[in-house]
A protein has these predicted regions:
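A short acidic/glycine-rich loop-to-helix N-cap element
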Residues: 159-166
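Gram-negative (and chloroplast) outer-membrane scaffold detector with strong preference
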Residues: 29-33, 38-46, 50-148, 177-179
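Conserved active-site loop/cleft motifs that coordinate metal ions or position small ligands
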Residues: 149-154
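N-terminal leader regions
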Residues: 164, 175-178
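Cleavable N-terminal export/targeting peptides
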Residues: 1-29
């Protein structure tokens, strides 16, 4: 009797381990609500600033995330000034993770609107005394490790002010966490 009970317990434990081994190793392959938070730095001819983004959405297909987000960028945007701009992007994000493994490469696309809410606009050169708005696009590649992400990318922003508009390109390096 004790041997049969022991064998039943071993069988239950073995089936539990086998079924969990066949599950999703990558959170991107679990359908339903998903979100991520990421932080990183921008480089253009040296250090150009930092950013934080939060996005939420849905894993609509295994490996494919679609969502919306908002962020904060503190970036030297104007080449005519040493003052950093306080930029707020709102965006749509598409992200595809290639493998259902603990370690998986991915591609990431973001695009949307960006606004300049710099508190020091009065210190900007003439013609930049109003808050500007425009659009941005970011493409990146990286590696997921369980719920963490490490990536590099290219960030392009265009902001229009009352008298002029400015474009800016920067390299991004960041880390993220998926929830």
């Amino acid at each position: 009797m004790k041997l049969n009970l022991f064998l039943c317990c071993v069988a239950v434990l073995a089936s539990t381990m086998i079924s969990s081994a066949q599950g999703n190793n990558n959170p991107s392959f679990t359908r339903g609500f998903a979100g991520n938070v990421e932080a990183g730095v921008l480089f253009k001819d040296g250090f150009a600033g930092e950013y934080v983004n939060v996005s939420s959405g849905c894993n609509i297909l295994p490996g494919l995330f679609a969502g919306v987000g908002i962020g904060i960028k503190n970036q030297k945007f104007h080449s005519l000034s040493d003052v950093n701009s306080f930029l707020v992007p709102t965006f749509i994000q598409l992200r595809y993770s290639f493998l259902n493994k603990s370690i998986s490469p991915f591609i990431n696309l973001k695009g949307g609107l960006i606004s300049d809410y710099s508190p020091s606009l009065k210190d900007m050169p003439e013609g930049f005394r109003d808050s500007g708005c425009g659009h941005f696009f970011r493409v990146g590649i990286g590696v997921d490790y369980k719920r963490y992400s490490f990536y590099v990318g290219d960030d392009w922003s265009q902001v229009s002010y009352s008298t002029a508009s400015r474009n800016n390109y920067a390299w991004t390096f960041g880390v993220g966490f998926k929830f």
